[in-house]
């Protein structure tokens, strides 16, 4: 779970090309949602990660500090425990949006817009900032970035499998 989440974080800065923490958060989470639309096995892994108590606890304890750094300016007086608790709410939203497939009535753009709005509202991001961030995220080529992340994930898994079996690495 840790590797799955940390590997995409490095790609986010390259995709966005900016250092606005709210935009980076929105892009990172939008990439997760996009990945689940492109790969059913990864959708199952993400949904499981946001369902099982052991992986949920890992997610919450490892993201609360990061969430505090991003959103504390919008929530004066909050403490780390507040962001841990709010991550429980945003994690539930994330799981729900990951589990629901896009369809004729619910495009990826609609899904990302609604998802990001829900999460940023939890963290008291002002509406004007939400609109700005969502517009920028929807303008990104998340499809290509998600495909690259999926391919890199598959390559790492294959390399790990080959190493575990004592097979030479593919060239």
Language-model segments: which ranges?
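HTH DNA-binding helix-turn interface
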Residues: 1-3
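Short, flexible helix-adjacent loops and helix caps
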Residues: 9, 13-17, 41-44, 71-76, ...
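Hydrophobic alpha-helical connector segments
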Residues: 9-42, 52, 60-64
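Short, surface-exposed acidic
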Residues: 19, 76-83, 128-131
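Amphipathic alpha-helical packing segments from all-alpha helical-bundle domains
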Residues: 27, 49-102, 106-118
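Phosphate/oxyanion-binding loops and surfaces in catalytic or ligand/nucleic-acid-binding neighborhoods
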Residues: 35, 39, 93, 100, ...
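Short, hydrophobic secondary-structure boundary micro-motifs
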Residues: 43-48, 128-132
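C-terminal peripheral helix-coil segments that are non-catalytic and often amphipathic
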Residues: 69, 73, 103-171
């Amino acid at each position: 779970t840790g590797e799955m989440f940390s590997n995409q974080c490095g790609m986010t800065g390259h995709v966005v090309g900016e250092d606005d923490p709210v935009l980076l958060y929105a892009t990172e989470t939008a990439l997760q949602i996009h990945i689940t639309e492109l790969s059913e096995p990864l959708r199952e892994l993400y949904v499981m990660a946001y369902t099982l108590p052991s992986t949920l606890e890992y997610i919450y304890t490892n993201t609360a500090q990061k969430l505090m750094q991003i959103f504390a300016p919008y929530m004066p007086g909050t403490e780390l425990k507040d962001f841990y608790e709010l991550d429980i709410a945003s994690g539930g939203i994330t799981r729900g949006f990951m589990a629901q497939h896009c369809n004729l009535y619910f495009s990826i753009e609609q899904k990302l817009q609604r998802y990001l709005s829900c999460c940023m509202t939890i963290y008291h991001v002002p509406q004007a900032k939400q609109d700005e961030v969502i517009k920028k995220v929807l303008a990104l080529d998340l499809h290509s970035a998600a495909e690259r992340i999926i391919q890199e994930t598959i390559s790492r898994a294959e390399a790990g499998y080959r190493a575990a079996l004592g097979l030479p690495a593919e060239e």
